[in-house]
């Protein structure tokens, strides 16, 4: 066991772990390329009908040690599809660094730095094409009250820009607070409130603005949610969910639902 080794280098290596996942799914036209490709990494663009690629690598230092731990995530997704109206391509590349520090038994500090690039290309719908870069910093402070109750305070600053088309840009600030209350397995309550300030430059009625602002509006936005879960019996659960949002230019939107879940 390197963790209990007398050598410092072995102890250091025991704190490091890594997870890697790769998947590739593709469909080709045998009329164009009748040869069966035994190499899954070889891609013939001319005969390609559909393509889905995913790669994820997560590097941990001091995994599951809340006193201090570091997580670096690299994620890459790519896809291509041919439809009757033309072909589409999209990709998503994420580089994320997550630092977690347990200050004491009551407070946990988490800081996330994110670098993301999203691209979309449509053959016949030019207004859906974008090349978006997103840089963000996201500190979060968690206060624990008891074994199952906690409250989160968070702030997120994002700078987002589109390098093609109308070259839209967005500076978004998000202040949020969330509350989690749980009484063992009998009932649970989750509440969240968020304030967004979107400083957006570009056409607010475009597909690009919807993607960059996640469906929110230019200026000030407010979102809130409440979820209550209760266990009626060993085989029956009921959930009450309420969602709301408001902005300067759109009337308040309310959305609620009730879910009844039976376990057999």
Feature map (PLM): residue ranges:
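Exposed, low-structure sequence patches enriched in small/polar residues
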Residues: 1-264
């Amino acid at each position: 066991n390197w963790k209990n080794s007398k050598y410092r280098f072995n102890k250091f290596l025991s704190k490091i772990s890594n997870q890697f996942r790769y998947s590739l799914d593709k469909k080709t036209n045998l009329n164009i390329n009748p040869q069966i490709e035994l190499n899954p990494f070889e891609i013939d663009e001319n005969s390609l009908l559909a393509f889905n690629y995913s790669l994820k690598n997560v590097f941990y230092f001091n995994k599951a040690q809340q006193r201090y731990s570091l997580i670096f995530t690299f994620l890459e997704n790519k896809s291509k599809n041919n439809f009757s109206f033309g072909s589409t391509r999209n990709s998503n590349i994420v580089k994320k660094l997550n630092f977690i520090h347990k200050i004491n038994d009551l407070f946990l500090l988490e800081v996330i730095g994110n670098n993301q690039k999203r691209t979309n290309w449509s053959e016949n719908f030019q207004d859906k094409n974008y090349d978006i870069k997103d840089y963000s910093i996201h500190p979060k402070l968690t206060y624990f009250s008891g074994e199952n109750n906690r409250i989160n305070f968070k702030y997120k600053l994002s700078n987002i820009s589109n390098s093609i088309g109308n070259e839209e840009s967005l500076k978004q600030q998000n202040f949020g607070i969330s509350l989690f209350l749980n009484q063992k397995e009998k009932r649970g309550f989750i509440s969240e409130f968020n304030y967004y300030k979107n400083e957006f430059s570009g056409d607010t009625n475009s597909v690009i603005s919807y993607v960059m602002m996640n469906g929110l509006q230019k200026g000030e936005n407010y979102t809130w949610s409440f979820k209550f879960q209760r266990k009626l019996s060993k085989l029956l659960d009921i959930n009450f969910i309420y969602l709301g949002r408001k902005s300067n230019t759109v009337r308040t939107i309310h959305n609620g639902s009730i879910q009844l879940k039976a376990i057999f």
